[in-house]
């Protein structure tokens, strides 16, 4: 990993800050969180939501989505230029759930985007507060990562669905800035690049003219982001080749899928941050907590602390298991969709089960679902320990991984061996090492084959008691390595549909 001197910390990305010391970073992240909280309180007042309704995660998602839509300049412009029937480009809305006579009712609300922007700016001292918007995008992205498996998207771009551990942030919008780029997995970046290359192959004018120049700049920028995620010289050199290609085509496509596979063993560094729903920040602000004064970090104890003291509710469909719904949201809150289940279970203090064993669908309720039998329950989002979130991929140890997911991407900085199935991964590397990247390919394959267990275990700190806020005494858990560790194992998760 490059030294901290050359990379801004995530919190600086998160708050667009220039170099700041730790205290300033904590304050600016706190300011961002406080702004989201104040906005949420104001929206609950506008909508006349009861305390319980305001703590309902479905209402939180609707309100978050409204403000993101209100600030989506590109889409707003597009909607105004291409008016579609029954869609007012100046309005935004969604379902709000209220408790009426002992039953949950759905009400569709509609607001002027201008009005939403005004409320947001007012909550953020008159600023656009883009960092806060990005923070909400990352929370939605983490929720999608825990809820859906991107099989179709992987297959469409010629990758193997078992590589899902590389797909963090695959549903993040393009406008999510540096903070968004930091949390995108290697597979996500590869997929974005492959989509561009495919368009270039099908559309002769894609790289030409004034528009093509902009496209080219975007392409090179994405290549550099991906290059920065790799930790070995050979992988980076291959990215230089892909970036410098005169006319990106099949050779680049091959190189990129090769690199994506190699990342299952020689892992990229992908940031993880705990982004919580607005309905957690709102009540905390309402209770008088001053995030800016106290300071806040997305990668330390703070989110765990906040969740220990928060009450969040969720609608539950008739045949869903509330404990499973809680697990889904807990994983989303800590960006742990691709973490080893043994590590997550240890930290959470209750067993975290694979996606295929969860009796719960996504958190959002579709507009055609019947509200009659809808219940609600408390989400259990507390944890037994806390751990620092990591931005490094760690390295891997030869351990069995599962049929549905052949590698993991660590979230918590906890020392362990990492599961992945070397034979499965290496089987993908038969054949093609010719062409202009042959020496790099050979070098990468050699590194993968010779990776020794100790090179490739994850050297992390350990977990901490919730009373140990200074992270003074790490507990290094021991894991039963005979067990299954991946979340999307033998999976039947729903597909993500935009």
Swiss-Prot record:
Q: How is it modified after translation?
A: Late in virus-infected cells, may be cleaved from a 56-kDa protein to a 53-kDa protein by a cellular caspase. This cleavage might be a marker for the onset of apoptosis in infected cells or have a specific function in virus host interaction.
Bias (Basic and acidic residues) occurs at 8-21
Q: Where is this motif: Bipartite nuclear localization signal?
A: 198-216
| Source species, domain of life | Viruses
Q: Name one Pfam family in it.
A: Flu_NP
Gene Ontology cellular-component annotations: helical viral capsid; host cell; host cell nucleus; ribonucleoprotein complex; viral nucleocapsid
Locate the motif Unconventional nuclear localization signal.
1-18
Family named by the database record:
Belongs to the influenza viruses nucleoprotein family.
Q: Which organism is it from?
A: Influenza A virus (strain A/USA:Phila/1935 H1N1)
Q: Which SUPFAM superfamilies match?
A: flu NP-like
What does the record give as the organism's lineage? Viruses, Riboviria, Orthornavirae, Negarnaviricota, Polyploviricotina
Cystine links in this protein are: none
Its recorded name reads Nucleoprotein
Q: Which GO terms describe its molecular function?
A: RNA binding; structural molecule activity
Instruction: Name where it's found.
Output: Virion; Host nucleus
Q: Which InterPro entries match?
A: Flu_NP
Q: Where is this region: Disordered?
A: 1-21
Q: Which GO terms describe its biological process?
A: symbiont entry into host cell; viral penetration into host nucleus
Q: What does this protein do?
A: Encapsidates the negative strand viral RNA, protecting it from nucleases. The encapsidated genomic RNA is termed the ribonucleoprotein (RNP) and serves as template for transcription and replication. The RNP needs to be localized in the host nucleus to start an infectious cycle, but is too large to diffuse through the nuclear pore complex. NP comprises at least 2 nuclear localization signals that are responsible for the active RNP import into the nucleus through cellular importin alpha/beta pathway.
